[in-house]
């Protein structure tokens, strides 16, 4: 165990050394002991948090998230469910019809024995009593002694909680019947960075945490099997598939067992428990272990295991090495949700859906947890990038998408439908502030993918692949921002690309280029293109003559101040002068008579986000 943790520490130090120019980061190291009553779903715990203030600021208060308090009538989450036009169907009852829905918040109907609850009963700092108060899901602690820059303090608390009825992500008795899905269950230190405290109320969307180490002991009924973040420290005492080969598990007359987990260099700790969990374990060639915990639908859960080992290897190669000693796929929660070193996901799905969910959640281990952008502020950097590599894995490893198909057509169509709906909002919108869940989902999952596909279109696939790998190398464990990523892309490609980040993600501008005019100029042909919308793009254009021979014409975008490699190497390429965005039209001459032209096509493989492809074709 010490060798594993030492290797992880060396790995983290190496990555940190690469990115010394990044801002400082706070550190929160947790020691927690919690006792769960599995009959009434209530628990009590203690927490010792060693907080390292690496900032240049003196901190006189600190804040904690109390996420479970969102699952109470009249909470902000409850209010949002009653006001948003398209609430999450899992969180509401429909008193009307599918055509004319009348939504009722499930949270509003919770009884006192069904609500979520997280309450602090005592709080101290370095042995001195601390004053605290809470409003909904945020706890404010006024410190008796300010935390000076570059100093540590120890915060101790006792707390009690109640696991809510399963409504979203965490709770009791999941749709698959898993007893406990314990995500965001403990008082969690709010992130403090160069922007200050991120005291965001929990409304059901994304998270942003503080890096730290977790030492967690969980005591509950001895018949339960526990799975979660971290490495189990007492496997030969607990058994349940954790034990070393050949070890005989000691019997106990006690009614409870205490499970001891340690997770290093993570920003969250999640667990699930059920007395009927089956546990399958696989050891990879590098010594890392992959775990599967499930209680129902064993055929599909068995079937996905060899596939997920292949996907794990694919992600290691595609992005970079997974640094932690293990990862667990756990039946629990609703849908699928990513956490530190594990995922909770529903199991009652068809194989294609289950393996797709597992692939998506595993990909989050790199983007949501290892790179760890502020996903509340930039959900598209997590969900979009995750969906991008999920889609590639589904095509290249799982073969769920035919090899001859362009894999991102679904993302484009989803984006196009959002544009047509008139509901699109700038993708820089905070995840909690979207007017509709529809606009949020398309922006985060689909437009986030398209951000990468359009970089591929602008600078070439090889440059994009190098960008993703370098992004991992330079920003693992560093909470990168959109600007950090685009600067990597600029360095790799040699292009100027800040404008693309601004235009595509910070506005709702769209692209529409058209073939405006095709005219004879003696033995040459003058082709005039027109920009009809505000989003700039370079242009790929195919000209096919009557003999069936195709010529590729590339029109660079001036503001990139560069050219991409030939993305169609099987066709001769002509590079014409760059097109400046301020010019609505662009004309160039082709050394081919008009009467010999059969067709002209903009973006022949439909790789750009042009919203109107009908005006991209000229045929005689």
Describe every region a protein language model picked out:
Residues 19-44, 56, 73, 498-499, ...:
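N-terminal, polar/Ser/Thr-rich
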Residues 27-28, 66, 261, 291-528:
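Hydrophobic alpha-helical and helix-loop surface patches within well-folded domains
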Residues 47-49, 53, 66, 151-165, ...:
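Short, hydrophobic/aromatic-enriched beta-strand segments in well-ordered soluble domains
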Residues 52, 58, 91-92, 97-177, ...:
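A surface-exposed beta-strand-loop module
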Residues 61-128, 182-183, 219, 223-224, ...:
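Solvent-exposed beta-hairpin/edge-strand motifs
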Residues 76-88, 160-214, 605-620:
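Glycine/proline-rich low-complexity spacer/linker segments in large multi-domain proteins
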Residues 188-196, 203-359, 388:
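Hydrophobic helix-coil surface modules that form long, contiguous segments used
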Residues 235, 363, 462, 475-620:
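Non-catalytic accessory/interaction domains
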């Amino acid at each position: 165990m010490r060798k594993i943790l030492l290797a992880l520490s060396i790995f983290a130090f190496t990555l940190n050394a690469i990115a010394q120019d990044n801002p400082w980061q706070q550190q929160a190291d947790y020691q927690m002991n919690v006792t769960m009553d599995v009959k009434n779903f209530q628990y009590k715990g203690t927490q010792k948090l060693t907080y390292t203030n690496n900032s240049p600021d003196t901190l006189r208060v600190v804040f904690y998230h109390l996420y479970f308090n969102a699952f109470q009538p009249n909470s902000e989450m409850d209010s949002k469910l009653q006001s948003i036009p398209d609430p999450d169907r899992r969180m509401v009852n429909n008193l009307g019809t599918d055509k004319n829905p009348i939504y009722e918040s499930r949270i509003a109907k919770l009884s006192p024995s069904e609500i979520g609850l997280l309450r602090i009963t005592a709080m101290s700092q370095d042995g001195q009593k601390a004053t605290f108060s809470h409003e909904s899901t945020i706890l404010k602690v006024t410190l008796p002694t300010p935390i000076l820059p570059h100093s540590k303090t120890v915060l101790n608390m006792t707390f009690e909680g109640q696991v809510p009825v399963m409504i979203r992500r965490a709770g009791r008795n999941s749709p698959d019947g898993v007893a406990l899905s314990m995500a965001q269950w403990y008082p969690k230190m709010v992130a403090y960075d160069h922007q200050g405290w991120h005291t965001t109320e929990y409304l059901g969307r994304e998270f942003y945490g503080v890096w730290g180490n977790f030492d967690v002991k969980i005591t509950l009924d001895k018949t339960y099997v526990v799975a979660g973040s971290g490495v189990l420290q007492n496997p030969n005492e607990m058994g349940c598939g954790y034990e070393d080969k050949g070890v005989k598990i000691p019997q106990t007359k006690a009614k409870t067992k205490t499970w001891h987990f340690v997770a290093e260099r993570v920003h969250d700790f999640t667990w699930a428990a059920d007395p009927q969990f089956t546990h399958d374990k696989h050891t990879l060639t590098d010594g890392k272990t992959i775990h599967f915990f499930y209680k129902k639908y064993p055929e599909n859960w068995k079937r996905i295991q060899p596939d997920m080992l292949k996907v794990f290897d694919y992600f290691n190669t595609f992005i970079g090495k997974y640094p932690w000693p293990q990862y667990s796929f756990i039946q629990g929660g609703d849908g699928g949700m990513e956490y530190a070193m594990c995922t909770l996901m529903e199991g009652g799905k068809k194989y294609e859906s289950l393996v797709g969910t597992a692939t998506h959640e595993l990909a989050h281990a790199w983007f949501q947890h290892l790179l760890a952008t502020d996903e509340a502020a930039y959900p598209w950097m997590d969900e979009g990038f995750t969906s991008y590599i999920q889609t590639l894995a589904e095509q290249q490893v799982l073969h769920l998408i035919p090899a001859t198909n362009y894999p991102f057509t679904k993302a484009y169509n989803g984006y196009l439908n959002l544009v047509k709906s008139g509901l699109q909002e700038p993708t820089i919108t905070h995840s909690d502030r979207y007017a509709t869940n529809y606009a949020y989902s398309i922006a985060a999952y689909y437009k986030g993918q398209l951000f990468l596909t359009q970089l591929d279109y602008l600078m070439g696939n090889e440059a994009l692949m190098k960008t993703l790998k370098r992004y991992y190398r330079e920003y693992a464990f560093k909470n990168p921002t959109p600007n950090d990523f685009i600067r990597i892309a600029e360095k790799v490609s040699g292009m100027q690309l800040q404008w693309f980040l601004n235009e595509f993600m910070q506005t709702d501008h769209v692209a529409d280029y058209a073939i405006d005019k095709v005219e004879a100029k003696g033995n040459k042909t003058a082709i005039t293109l027109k920009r009809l919308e505000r989003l700039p793009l370079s242009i790929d254009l195919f000209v096919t003559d009557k003999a069936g021979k195709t010529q590729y014409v590339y029109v660079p975008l001036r503001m990139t101040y560069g050219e991409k490699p030939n993305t169609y190497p099987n066709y001769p390429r002509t590079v014409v002068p760059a097109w400046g965005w301020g010019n609505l039209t662009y004309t160039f001459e082709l050394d081919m008579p008009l009467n010999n032209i059969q067709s002209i096509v903009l973006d022949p493989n439909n790789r750009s986000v042009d919203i109107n492809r009908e005006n991209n074709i000229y045929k005689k």
